[in-house]
Amino acid sequence: MARANEIKRGMVVNYNDKLLLVKDIDVQSPSARGASTLYKMRFSDVRTGLKVEERFKGDDILDTITLTRRTVTFSYIDGDEYVFMDDEDYTPYLFKKDQIEEELLFIPEGGMPGIQVLSWDGQIIALELPQTVDLEIVDTAPGIKGASASARNKPATMSTGLTIPVPEYLSAGEKIRIHIPERRYMGRAD
């Protein structure tokens, strides 16, 4: 059991007899005094895959489910299924493309370290990515010299198809670090 203000992205809650995976949380603080903060949560139903949206007050109690986490590595694509191998015992985990469509935007061609498979009671629930990823810019407007002083951004498409705003001074071919939960540019990759 946890209060709504303690729920984080990637957790699973049991709500209305449904297992719901938390995909996103928006915090809304009302301007009136004494009013409680609202948490608008977007879920994915674990059993059906449907998207669910609910609102909670900060002190509402939710039933959280403890998940098993296994570190995996992207292995190969088999038709419309993506296969990830367990790093310890080499167990294959299969995901359909539509199950992990969002996550695929952040996984580069050679894979990335830190990917975890979330399971509960032997059932595979989701794929969890690390907080950051380094991706290469493949398409953007040409870089402008001396634009580092301005805070203006331009859209850039990464090697995986993801499009995010980046500073004007960056150009195609550069590797950048992206904060996955917020889909934002953090800096140049090392």
From Swiss-Prot:
Domain of life: Bacteria
Family matches, as SMART domains: EFP, Elong-fact-P_C
GO biological process: peptide biosynthetic process
PROSITE patterns in the cross-refs: EFP
Disulphide bridges: none
NCBIfam families on file: PRK00529.1, PRK04542.1, yeiP
Record protein name field: Elongation factor P-like protein
Source organism (scientific name): Pectobacterium carotovorum subsp. carotovorum (strain PC1)
